[in-house]
Amino acid sequence: GPFLVQSLKRDSDSFWSGDAFAVIFDPVNERTNGAIFGVNSEGVQTEALITGEPARRGGQLSGYNKAWDNKWYTEASVSENGWTAEMMIPFKSLRFGKKDHWGINFIRIDANNNANHSWAPVPIQFYGTDLGYLGQLIWDKPPKNTKKNISFVPYLLGDAYKDFENQSNLNQSFDIGMDAKIAINSNLNLDLTVNPDFSQVDVDEQQTNLTTVNLRFPERRLFFLENSDIFSNFGTNAKPFFSRKIGLDDDGNTIPIIYGARLSGNLNKNLRIGLMNTQTQEQELPGNNYSSLALHQRVLKRSVLRGYFHNRVGFSEGSIKGDDFNRIGGLEFNYSSVDSKWRAMAGYGLAFSNENQDQNHIFNLLGGYGGRAFNVMVNISGLGDNYINDFSLIPRQKHYDAVQDTTYILGFNHWWATMGYKFYPENTFINQHGFSLTTNGDRTTTSNELIQDKHALSYKILMKNTSTLDLTYAHEGVNLLYPFRFTDDDTPLPA
């Protein structure tokens, strides 16, 4: 010691910046999905689903779902010689079959020496959580599944109030509902909800938005969490599915859900399925029925062929509104080499409604290489002017005109590319240093007008004492296509 602890909050964003120990499980042993459980020297826990290749883009860490929570137990103690941790993880929190080989790895973060260690070696250019480099846990006998893994959580809420000043009558209200989770088998799970109560869900972290782009908050509602990557892991910049579009309006206010059913998991070792249906309540606006189907078929060693179909249909006065619908479909191929160095993606999708039948496409292309020293990645994506997706929150698609009080939907093409080179000197105070060049931007599909762009050249030195020297030259521009104001009281900025 002393040992570094950045936060005592569970699942903190700064958890991995301090001393920590973690174990990774891949019970299916296909190197495409896993779960990580971590603890620091003060016994603070974190856990997450690993839903892809861990990476950073735009300062955001991707490939993890930290909203996934399970009940497990840890104890940690600090002594003169170091610190120790004891972990007890109930296997009922994992989905596994009768396989006697699991993927596993152990990670140790030594913050004082700015070093990460893993039991199964991982090349230095990758995160220690990369599933392509897991070791093997071999069971003499595979662990037994719990015969009955069913949880049922009913609730009853009531309130009463009276205005004594105005001598009003006593007003009372009651609400009842339930949530259920049923393990169909060791790899397939059924979630059910009736009139769900999401009042226990963590509130969104308040953020100030001074941009023209809507903020994207993480999903925290339990019903939508398990195996959420089956539905959401499509695309890069423009993703065709975002579960917070169901049961929440654009301002985060609740739209009551009448019921929901969700089947997700592995049908076999190579095929994952997600099937969901939910119904929202009719209020001032018609209710909606949302249906989603997503399939992930593993091909080659670590590659995945994926497809999705989403359907929204309006309901009013107990009947379907035939002219109020939105249907989304698409296919995607995601290639990853066994050693994780090469990666490629290609996807195409269409959106249908009763009004728009052309310029309703979305596409995504990505390719790159990540070696020990040299890395390069290029991503090009785009969508048409009539790609209207009620299941998605796509940045820079909607543009608000503060003068006309009108929102315009525009198709755009997006590019993002990065290239870098790292050096690993053998001396006493530098871990690594290197440069990177990054560019990204968006232009409208029809008129090729610039929406935004950013170009940056960076040189970074990482010291062994955890210090960092970062020299960056960046040029960033935003083109207002329509007048914009930060608040309702501001004078709009001209386009």
Model-assigned labels for residue ranges:
Residues G1-R298, R306-G307:
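Structural preference for beta-rich elements and adjacent junctions enriched in aromatics
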Residues E282-L365, G384:
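Beta-propeller domains
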Residues S41, F91, R108-D110, G158-K162, ...:
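Transmembrane beta-strands of outer-membrane beta-barrel pores
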Residues I50-G52, H117-W119, F164-N169, D204-Q207, ...:
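Outer-membrane beta-barrel translocator domains and adjoining extracellular loop/strand segments
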Residues L94-D100, P142-I150, N187, N270, ...:
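Short loop/turn motifs that connect adjacent beta-strands in outer-membrane beta-barrel proteins
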Residues E86, G103, S151-Y155, N189-T193, ...:
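Residue-level detector of the transmembrane beta-barrel scaffold of outer-membrane proteins
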Residues P256-I258, S264, D339, R343-A495:
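Exposed, low-structure sequence patches enriched in small/polar residues
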Residues A20-A22, T84-E86, S151-Y155, G177-M178, ...:
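Membrane-embedded beta-strand positions in outer-membrane beta-barrel channels/transporters
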